[in-house]
Regions:
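Loop-rich catalytic cores of soluble enzymes, especially ATP-dependent carboxylate-amine ligases
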Residues: 1-83, 104, 133-136, 154-158
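Intrinsically disordered or highly flexible coil/loop and linker segments, enriched in small
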Residues: 70, 74, 103, 124, ...
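Glycine-rich, often proline-containing surface loops adjacent to acidic residues and nearby aromatics
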Residues: 87-101
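N-terminal and secondary-structure boundary signal
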Residues: 90, 110, 114, 164-167, ...
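Flexible helix-coil linker/hinge segments at domain or subdomain boundaries
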Residues: 120-148
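Acidic, Ser/Thr-rich low-complexity intrinsically disordered segments
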Residues: 143-189
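Extended, compositionally biased alpha-helical segments that mediate assembly or anchoring
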Residues: 190-288
């Protein structure tokens, strides 16, 4: 993830291992239990009881920013690390995927197919433990691509050697294509998604970001105006769509109503103060 935007500079000091789940849990747990002198000053100077949850390097593990995070879908109020510790990993949360502004729901079907195939590719590919140098190398590559990915001929580091984003990307796509040929999945759709990605790597003018630039410049409008116009167009599309609701829409609406009912139950049933709730959440529901 880029260093542009919201930052917690203390996180730059963290080296959270992705080699083993136990290491990931232990190191994040240590960060949530280690007091930061910098954050301690906030607690002592503001005079507000709940100016922050705690003065630790991480207040809770959810504050840790990374491009992906292991998650548990176990339904409980326990903290995420405790759920991971007791129930394992159910899914991977991808946190650095740009929305496609030209798609009403933010992502296209072929994009979803590509992500599915890419995750399967990552799962089956040999992955050795990362050392500190390799972890920093990955971090530096992420920063370069997130900030300068549109620059022609951008070079990043692969095993201490330089390689262009384009060449490495094409290597990965070739390996993903081999995976399709060896599996029983619906090959045609996945081949199409790979073909689309390959074209964008070979010609960055075909990427959504390039289309954004072109429309903003050609229309002589600001980025904000561009976003507003696109949002209005998507809104009209939804409003003008068929009155018949899809199964997904019904599921979402049912979930909204269920959440409202559960919220009211909590309000009426709980006499616990926020202070007690916070102590219970931070202490009783943390991993062992």
């Amino acid at each position: 993830m880029s260093d542009i935007g919201y930052q917690n500079t203390k996180q730059k000091e963290l080296q959270i291992s992705l080699n083993k789940l136990s290491e990931y849990i232990d190191q994040l747990k240590a960060a949530t239990n280690t007091t930061s002198n910098e954050f301690l000053k906030i607690e002592n100077s503001h005079g507000v009881e709940f100016s922050q949850l705690s003065p630790n390097v991480l207040q809770i593990e959810d504050e840790y920013y990374s491009s992906s995070r292991p998650k548990s879908s176990y339904n409980s109020e326990d903290r995420m690390l405790k759920k991971l510790q007791e129930h394992g990993v159910d899914y991977i949360e991808l946190r650095s995927i740009d929305l496609n502004p030209f798609k009403p729901c933010g992502i296209g079907y072929r994009n979803l197919l590509f992500l599915e195939l890419f995750l399967i590719y990552c799962l089956q590919k040999d992955s050795f433990d990362l050392n500190d140098y390799e972890t920093k190398e990955i971090r530096n590559n992420d920063l370069l691509v997130s900030k300068e990915g549109r620059r022609p001929g951008l070079m990043i580091t692969k095993s201490k050697s330089k390689i262009s984003v384009k060449d490495w990307g094409l290597e990965i796509l070739d390996e993903m294509e081999e995976l399709i040929s060896e599996s029983n999945i619906k090959k045609e759709l996945f081949y199409e998604s790979l073909s689309e990605s390959r074209k964008m790597l070979q010609d960055p003018n075909l990427t959504p970001s390039s289309e954004v630039f072109s429309q903003v410049i050609d229309s002589n409008i600001s980025y904000e105006e561009f976003g507003k116009n696109l949002g209005e167009a998507h809104k009209k599309q939804y409003l003008n769509s068929s009155d018949s609701k899809s199964d997904n829409e019904r599921v979402i609406e049912n979930e909204i109503e269920r959440s409202k009912v559960e919220s009211e139950k909590l309000k009426n049933a709980s006499e616990e103060s926020f202070k007690d709730y916070l102590r219970n959440y931070l202490i009783d529901k943390k991993p062992k």
